Amino acid sequence: MTQTLPVGLSATSVVAASSANLGPGFDSLGIALSLYDEIVVETVESGLTVHVEGEGAGQVPLDQTHLVVRAINKGLQAAGFSAPGLVVRCRNDIPHSRGLGSSAAAVVGGLAAVNGLVTQAGSEPMDDARLIQLSSEFEGHPDNAAAAVLGGAVVSWTEQAGAFGGEPRYSAVPVRLHPDIRLFPAVPQQRSSTAETRVLLPEQVSHVDARFNLSRAALLVVALSERPDLLMAATEDVLHQPQRAAAMPASAEYLAILRRCGIAAVLSGAGPSVLGLSAQSGLPAEALEYGTAHGFTVTEMSVGAGVRWTAGAVVRN
């Protein structure tokens, strides 16, 4: 039986950006970045009000189709609750449609905020495994969602639904990140969507290409955790980055320049952002100057934390 939450409850969640694939780990590897969105949810007598500040303001819908609202409704349903009405406030720092996991952050943040609401009604919160499952059902793959839930670097996988149907099972485990590794996201003004770039990928790949990526993905786990000196070889990919290059030539060119400068650069998710991984303390001047001159915002970030939620409206400064 569904319970109705009382009026006057509030909850806050803070959720990180993420970069998926990391080169060879297509739909499997991901890492959280220290760039965060904040969601504050309140239960009210009736209706729905959505406020958006920062990224996406004036561009995203402010009704039931808003991704955060959809995630909240899914989380409430999974927990056996409904809300009489909601006020949802989103403070967004994660760029949209840039390959930095903004949609995964919206979903994970919405689900986590539900934890803050239902615990005030005497219910147990959803654990990380449940958050990964529900958020990945939105995404269709768990790499960004798992990184947003767990923080740090993750390896995720999908077990297909059985003969009787149902959702696939999504899971993830954390990867210990070597302390010397630095993250350098480069974000262009250009936008892109995962759906648009996935159609560029072939339905089938050769055994040679599959073997190449399998070896690099396995090596990348070692490079991330123990051997940063192997990052250049470990981030090579033949399954998706070359195929997407024509749709984002500026990103492909900057990726190549970073790699020529010794930075293990990859497309961030489906692009168009580029992520550099390095044990160096900064980017070479040539790489930084090229990025700035060609419209990329290049920064150094630390690894992001896992999603945090609390009962009550706790707004960050």
Swiss-Prot record:
Coiled coil: none annotated. This is Homoserine kinase. Gene3D superfamilies: 3.30.230.10, GHMP kinase, C-terminal domain. Belongs to the GHMP kinase family. Homoserine kinase subfamily. Catalyzes the ATP-dependent phosphorylation of L-homoserine to L-homoserine phosphate. It catalyses: L-homoserine + ATP = O-phospho-L-homoserine + ADP + H(+). GO terms for biological process: threonine biosynthetic process. It comes from Mycolicibacterium smegmatis (strain ATCC 700084 / mc(2)155) (Mycobacterium smegmatis). GO terms for cellular component: cytoplasm. It comes from the Bacteria. It is found in: Cytoplasm. GO terms for molecular function: ATP binding; homoserine kinase activity. Pathway: Amino-acid biosynthesis; L-threonine biosynthesis; L-threonine from L-aspartate: step 4/5. ATP binds at P95, H96, S97, R98, G99, L100, G101, S102, S103, A104, A105. Keywords: Amino-acid biosynthesis, ATP-binding, Cytoplasm, Kinase, Nucleotide-binding, Threonine biosynthesis, Transferase. InterPro entries: GHMP_kinase_C_dom, GHMP_kinase_C_sf, GHMP_kinase_N_dom, GHMP_knse_ATP-bd_CS, Homoserine_kinase, Ribosomal_Su5_D2-typ_SF, Ribsml_uS5_D2-typ_fold_subgr. Its main location: cytoplasm. Its EC number is 2.7.1.39.
